[in-house]
């Protein structure tokens, strides 16, 4: 059985920790073992205990207090310290060969755009520890239901996809917060979006000088295949199971077992 890791990425407030807890709960229900690896030195308490916690090595509050750094500077310092002490991470991971490790990552995008911290950790996990990795990038549905904000979120997800060079699954989280307010037809347009159509909608509320920029961004999103998001309701077991089936497929978990293909289409009516 493969050594599998799932990186949970996305901006602050996207529901990453809730998603991690939902995956753990679902796996316990179906008899699979998984552990959460907390890579956020500023993490809040979780429903499930972290099996591995970066705060046992270094914490954001301690760095801010001792070095008089702001939150972002302290976060970067924490990860630079982790990179110098990867033997600690190796020892903590130990022999989790037959179980999922779910890496709950911080929301600051600069950790993989401005400095190569997360990409270096990914390479270490793949090269030294022989992990099959998959990245999930969460965007919250109440935020991206606006066309212009959708493109902002899609570009941040694309940055993660390109810089981490991992199999990549985009997730539209907190769908339960808006599915009663917006019609199914409108929600489907964001799960399987027509980038050019959304760009035209965004143009209606912008100065005409930005129209060409919108079209270029839409073309970029289309070219990189950022055309589908999986819907997530964290309290809906079927929603969580569908996303897990995609993760299993791209990581080739338990190749010896009978493979179950993920759904070809995501239907909002199933939620």
UniProtKB/Swiss-Prot annotation:
Gene Ontology biological process: mitotic sister chromatid cohesion; protein import into nucleus
Alphabetized UniProt keyword annotations: GTP-binding, Hydrolase, Nucleotide-binding
Subunit-level organization: Heterodimers with GPN1 or GPN2. Binds to RNA polymerase II (RNAPII).
Chain positions of motif Gly-Pro-Asn (GPN)-loop: 70-72
Record-linked InterPro entries: Gpn, Gpn3, P-loop_NTPase
Family indicated by similarity: Belongs to the GPN-loop GTPase family.
A UniProt-annotated Pfam family: ATP_bind_1
Entries under Gene3D superfamilies matching the protein: P-loop containing nucleotide triphosphate hydrolases (3.40.50.300)
GO MF term set: GTP binding; GTPase activity
Cleavable signal peptide: none
Classification via CDD domains: GPN3 (cd17872)
Site (Stabilizes the phosphate intermediate): 72
Main function: Small GTPase required for proper nuclear import of RNA polymerase II and III (RNAPII and RNAPIII). May act at an RNAP assembly step prior to nuclear import.
Species for this entry: Candida glabrata (strain ATCC 2001 / BCRC 20586 / JCM 3761 / NBRC 0622 / NRRL Y-65 / CBS 138)
Residues that bind GTP: 13-18, 173-176
Name of the protein described by the UniProt record: GPN-loop GTPase 3
């Amino acid at each position: 059985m493969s050594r599998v890791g799932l990186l949970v990425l996305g901006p602050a407030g996207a529901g990453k920790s809730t998603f991690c807890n939902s995956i753990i709960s679902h796996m316990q229900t179906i008899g699979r073992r998984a552990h959460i690896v907390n890579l956020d030195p500023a993490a809040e308490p979780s429903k499930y205990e972290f099996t591995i916690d970066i705060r046992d090595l270094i914490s954001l509050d301690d760095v801010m207090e001792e070095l008089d750094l702001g939150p972002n500077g302290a976060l970067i310092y924490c990860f630079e310290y982790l990179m110098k002490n990867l033997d600690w991470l190796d020892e903590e991971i130990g022999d989790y060969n037959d179980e999922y490790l779910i890496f709950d990552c911080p929301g600051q995008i600069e950790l993989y755009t401005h400095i190569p911290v997360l990409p270096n950790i990914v390479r270490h996990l793949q090269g030294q520890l022989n992990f099959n990795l998959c990245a999930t990038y969460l965007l919250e549905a109440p935020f991206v239901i606006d066309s212009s904000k959708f493109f902002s979120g899609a570009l941040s997800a694309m940055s993660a996809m390109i810089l981490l060079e991992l199999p990549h699954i985009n997730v539209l989280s907190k769908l339960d917060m808006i599915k009663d307010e917006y019609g199914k037809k409108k929600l489907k347009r964001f799960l399987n979006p027509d980038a050019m159509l959304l760009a035209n909608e965004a143009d209606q509320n912008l100065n005409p000088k930005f129209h060409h920029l919108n079209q270029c961004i839409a073309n970029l999103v289309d070219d990189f295949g950022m055309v589908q998001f999986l819907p997530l309701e964290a309290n809906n077991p079927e929603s969580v199971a569908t996303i897990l089936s995609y993760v299993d497929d791209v990581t080739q978990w338990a190749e010896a077992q009978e493979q179950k293909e993920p759904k070809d289409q995501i239907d909002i009516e199933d939620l």
